[in-house]
Amino acid sequence: MTICEFYTVIGGNYDEVLGRLQHEELVRRFVKRFLTDRTHENLVAARNNNDVASAFRAAHTLKGVAATLGFDGLTTTASALTEKLRPQTGFPDDEYFSAVGREYDRVIAA
């Protein structure tokens, strides 16, 4: 699968990412690096440990990485979760975590 095909599968905007990063090799390298990024794992661990502050940081980081890489679905869901966690007064409904998990899995599976 080409990097363009990957972005089509995940519903991302390859041209926008290429414009931001300037070189296809950089896009490819950062997408591959995402496969080993532990931010989503940290988010899940924070949720399991009932650590709202760490969950907020992980969701915010995931949102930023996803936005930079043009993972639009993951950006949208991570952004919604980040805003629900921002007050750091408790966890939102599980649907927010589930939505992030589904989009994360979709990117990883592609």
Feature map (PLM): residue ranges:
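Two-component system phosphorelay core
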Residues: 1-57, 61-110
